[in-house]
Amino acid sequence: MDIKLKDFEGPLDLLLHLVSKYEVDIYDVPIVEVIEQYLAYLATLQAMKLEVAGEYMLMASQLMLIKSRKLLPTVVEDEPEADDPELELLSQLEEYAHFKAASQVLAKKHEVRAQYFSKPKVELVYEDVTLNQDKTIQDIFLAFSKIMAEKQEEIRRRHTTIARDDYKIEDMMLIIEEAFSAKNKLFLDELFSDAKDMNQVITLFLATLELIKIHRISVQQETIFGTITLRKEWTNE
């Protein structure tokens, strides 16, 4: 069973996605929070054994430098630094945001012209999942990144050393459906409360994505960075 996650166009695209959630000016975002979310996202990709392009890892090293500088005690200097990596990054993000917005406008104009001057475009259908309130699989994935980091720390504190690698997505789908037998909704983090190791956590998440994809469950997130709620979309027979 293959579940594809829609890739970002690059590290700046991922960062812009994270920054845009705060709905403030780019220069006013809590940069350390954004950096932590970016690093958690990459850590989740690696834990799920998904390929991470080198450009994302390069950006991660730059972000770790910025984060370390932000967390260090402030030192009063006579002259400001010529090169501020944080300001440079935010400037790049601002420029990328303008470029992306302009490219989207051009793409829409091209589609309008194509309707009048060319044959109907035949598209290769990519089955992406549209969630309530314009949420995407990436939003669920980013929420899961935080849950996984917390679960990983919990398992580490328990000193758990035995791990299985034979969990099946189909079996986890049945377990999730069983969890809905007595209720119509669950919080995303509830699914992982009894997970014994990270392999089970990851397989449960993939099973959740598959159930969303086939419309067995739907997803809601009332506020930005709020709790993810899963709702049952079938009736008990």
From Swiss-Prot:
Pfam families: SMC_ScpA
Signal peptide, first to last residue: none
GO cellular component: cytoplasm
Domain of life: Bacteria
InterPro entries, per database record: ScpA (IPR003768)
Keywords: Cell cycle, Cell division, Chromosome partition, Cytoplasm
Protein location: Cytoplasm
GO biological process, one term: cell division
HAMAP family cross-referenced by the UniProt entry: ScpA
Database matches in NCBIfam families: PRK00104.1-2 (NF000993)
Family under the similarity heading: Belongs to the ScpA family.
Described purpose of this protein according to its UniProt entry: Participates in chromosomal partition during cell division. May act via the formation of a condensin-like complex containing Smc and ScpB that pull DNA away from mid-cell into both cell halves.
Assembly, per entry: Component of a cohesin-like complex composed of ScpA, ScpB and the Smc homodimer, in which ScpA and ScpB bind to the head domain of Smc. The presence of the three proteins is required for the association of the complex with DNA.
Protein name: Segregation and condensation protein A
